[in-house]
C-alpha cells in the first residue's frame, strides 16, 4: 500500500512540476513586446532623441536605430 501511494505521489508531482516548466514556455509575442519597450526606453534616454512620434520604419540619421513607436531620433 505504501508503494502505491509513493508511486502515485511521484507521478502526480512529476507531472505537475515538469509539465509546468517544460510545457509552458514564455510566449514569444510578450517577450518581443518587452524587448521593443526596452529599445524604446533606450531611445528615450539617448541625447539624439526628441519627444515626437515618427512613422514606422524611419531610420534615425545619427544613430542606426529603426523607430517603431514612441520617441524618435533626429
From Swiss-Prot:
PTM notes: Contains 3 disulfide bonds.
Location, primary (coarse class): secreted
Compartments reported by the entry: Secreted
Protein purpose: Inhibits voltage-gated potassium channels.
Coiled coil: none
UniProt tissue specificity: Expressed by the venom gland.
Propeptide section residues: 20-41
Name of the protein: Kappa-scoloptoxin(07)-Ssm2e
Protein family: Belongs to the scoloptoxin-07 family.
Entry keywords, A to Z: Cleavage on pair of basic residues, Disulfide bond, Ion channel impairing toxin, Neurotoxin, Potassium channel impairing toxin, Secreted, Signal, Toxin, Voltage-gated potassium channel impairing toxin
Annotated S-S bridges: none
GO CC terms, sorted: extracellular region
An MF annotation (GO) of this entry: potassium channel regulator activity
Organism annotation: Scolopendra mutilans (Chinese red-headed centipede)
Signal peptide: 1-19
Protein origin, superkingdom: Eukaryota
